[in-house]
From Swiss-Prot:
Acts as a chaperone. Residues 603-635 are annotated as: Disordered. One of its GO terms (molecular function) is unfolded protein binding. It comes from Edwardsiella ictaluri (strain 93-146). Residues 603-613 have a biased composition (Low complexity). This is Chaperone protein DnaK. The gene is dnaK. The keyword Chaperone applies. HAMAP family: DnaK (MF_00332). Keywords: ATP-binding, Chaperone, Nucleotide-binding, Phosphoprotein, Stress response. Belongs to the heat shock protein 70 family. The lineage of its organism: Bacteria, Pseudomonadati, Pseudomonadota, Gammaproteobacteria, Enterobacterales.
């Protein structure tokens, strides 16, 4: 059985790890970095760039450079969050035919899972390069507060990337695994505060250690799937744009190129202000008008940045209170606080968390790598490489159905340990009703319309009876990935209907299969291109080597052989410019045959050189070694 890799598919950066010799190891990508920017670019010549190469060209290609796609995964176009992003992103967010939020690149609509699959493919390739074998299985992490649709869409992205997703696990839980495996023994209750590039989670986790066997039990989780470093960047960008407008009277929001440069500068300034008290945002030639070029030079202090993002940090505090209340604990019950996600490097965030819990967060857990390490540990558990670890996760939101009067009736409450199964009997609302619609919902509101709709299906063929008489048993079954399966059964007739909630991941089985085929076709095209390049290089080396030998042979090479070789070289050079691998290989063989006489001459010259070297060595052998004694002058 091959390795099951662990992937942290992040909003801003992604990371991959694998169990290696009993320990989780974070892998370096082709650029030598341990994290990869979750950025995908579609270039003018049809190439797809991922990670650092995509980030580098973002300034010149803002409309086709996609970042923070995780914020759109599993979302409807009309969702408030998607609408908010639509107004601030340089790329085009559009409605798909099924109402999902997709992205338009060069007049083509692309689904977020398909875009995220490009990042997953790079993670897969990074692991394959390290392991020296094909990787087909992975554990992928998601924010704890992701709903069913977002989890399903993440799983779809894995499939499109050619991965069998063995388990979807929550990011804070993965971070707790990384911490718990590394930090010795003893029972502890920890709080994982995870503020990443686009999402925020808080999980309260109990680690029980009995005779070296560790149980990680999530007691409660809460969060906000649209709060993260990208929002912090946006606040700073808006401030810089407004300041520039005051100074120069030009609104940079209408200039995608300037906005892309500003985005990079704002992110850099934010990072610098975690260690410095002030920084300069200096962008020469940011734009121009009739009076000439304009330059941006704005000083930003740490205090200014903190005042801009104060409300965002405060927003993360409310879920902390709810999670503690749901876990039935107070702050004094928390033994350790773990910070995860790049945005937690901001001193203001660290101070607010420390003030809330009354203790300093631990600094010995790498916020960028802990989640991938935990995912690799879970991969090791599933592969049987890691023993004595049990993970008990929870469902983040209540699940139920719409009942009479537009009310949501919960079948599974939030923070229920998964996997779990629950059934409840319902009845009809009208006399002689022959069918019922099961409308599946996720959320905490009483009114059905205020919750997230996960999908609906019909159960028909109910025998006519007065209202309230038929017995319809609805069963909710959540698997270990936190994905929901729902069935409804008429207890009288035995008729049953069931669905796995696909909801607004929105991709049908056929669409996913087509995307998998496209990805495989691209992989095949990439392989063929690589082979073609190798053959071209081989041809180039042969041409260079042959010309050198012709020069060295001089007059010793008969004129007929020389002209035959020159013809074969020209033919090979012409073939190398084309795309036909077989033709290049044939021309290589033709040149090898034409230069047989040349190879013979080269061999003879080499042997003659060796014989000469032997003769001079013999002469050296005749020299007698004499011992000598140093005579010192007498003084």
């Amino acid at each position: 059985m091959g390795k099951i890799i662990g992937i942290d598919l992040g909003t801003t950066n992604s990371c991959v790890a694998v169990m290696d010799g009993g320990k989780a190891r974070v892998l370096e990508n082709a650029e030598g970095d341990r994290t990869t920017p979750s950025i995908i670019a579609y270039t003018q010549d049809g190439e797809v760039l991922v990670g650092q190469p995509a980030k580098r060209q973002a300034v010149t290609n803002p409309q086709n450079t996609l970042f923070a796609i995780k914020r759109l995964i599993g979302r409807r176009f009309e969702d408030a969050e998607a609408q908010r992003d639509k107004d601030i992103m340089p790329y085009k967010i559009v409605a798909a035919d099924n109402g999902d939020a997709w992205v338009e690149v060069k007049d083509q609509k692309i689904a977020p899972p398909q875009i995220s699959a490009e990042v997953l493919k790079k993670m897969k390739k990074t692991a394959e390069d390290f392991l020296g074998e094909t990787v087909t299985e992975a554990v992928i992490t998601v924010p704890a507060y992701f709903n069913d649709a977002q989890r399903q869409a993440t799983k779809d992205a894995g499939r499109i990337a050619g991965l069998d997703v063995k388990r979807i696990i929550n990011e804070p839980t993965a971070a707790a695994l990384a911490y718990g495996m590394d930090k010795g023994v003893g029972n502890r209750t920890i709080a994982v505060y995870d503020l990443g590039g686009g999402t925020f989670d808080i999980s309260i986790i109990e680690i029980d250690d009995v005779d070296g066997e560790k149980t990680f039990e999530v007691l409660a989780t809460n969060g906000d799937t649209h709060l993260g470093g990208e929002d912090f960047d946006s606040r700073l960008i808006n401030y810089l744009v407004d300041e520039f407008k005051k100074e120069q009277g030009i609104d940079l929001r209408n200039d995608p190129l300037a906005m892309q440069r500003l985005k990079e500068a704002a992110e850099k300034a934010k990072i610098e202000l975690s260690s410095a008290q002030q920084t300069d945002v200096n962008l020469p030639y940011i734009t121009a008008d009739a009076t000439g070029p304009k330059h941006m030079n704005i000083k930003v202090t740490r205090a200014k940045l903190e005042s801009l993002v104060e409300e965002l940090v405060a927003r993360s505090m409310e879920p902390l209170k709810v999670a503690l209340k749901d876990a039935g604990l107070s702050v004094s019950d928390i033994d350790d606080v773990i910070l995860v996600g790049g945005q937690t490097r901001m001193p203001m965030v660290q101070k607010q968390v420390a003030d809330f819990f009354g203790k300093e967060p631990r600094k010995d857990v790498n916020p960028d790598e802990a989640v991938a390490i935990g995912a690799a540990v879970q991969g090791g558990v599933l592969a049987g490489d890691v023993k004595d670890v049990l993970l008990l996760d929870v469902t983040p939101l209540s699940l139920g159905i719409e009942t009479m009067g537009g009310v949501m009736t919960a079948l599974i409450s939030k923070n229920t340990t998964i996997p779990t199964k629950h059934s409840q009997v319902f009845s009809t609302a009208e006399d002689n009703q022959s069918a019922v619609t099961i409308h599946v919902l996720q959320g905490e509101r009483k009114r059905a319309a205020d919750n997230k709709s996960l999908g609906q299906f019909n159960l028909d063929g109910i025998q006519p009876a007065p209202r309230g008489m038929p017995q319809i048993e609805v069963t909710f079954d959540i698997d270990a990935d936190g994905i929901l399966h729902v069935s409804a059964k008429d207890k009288n007739s035995g008729r049953e209907q069931n669905i796995t909630i696909k909801a607004s991941s929105g991709l049908s089985e056929d669409e996913i299969k087509q995307m998998v085929r496209d990805a495989e076709a691209n992989a095949e095209a990439d392989r063929k291109f690589e082979e073609l390049v190798q053959v071209r290089n081989q041809a180039d080396q042969l041409v260079h080597g042959t010309r050198k030998l012709v020069e060295e042979a001089g007059d010793k090479l008969p004129a007929t052989d020389k002209s035959a070789i020159e013809e074969a070289v020209k033919a090979l050079e012409a073939a190398s410019k084309g795309e036909d691998k077989a033709d290049i290989e044939a021309k290589i063989q033709a040149l090898v045959q034409s230069s047989a006489k040349l190879q013979e001459l080269a061999q003879q010259q080499a042997q003659a050189g060796e014989a000469q070297a032997d003769t001079s060595a013999k002469k050296d052998d005749d020299v007698v070694d004499a011992e000598f004694e140093e005579v010192k002058d007498k003084k």
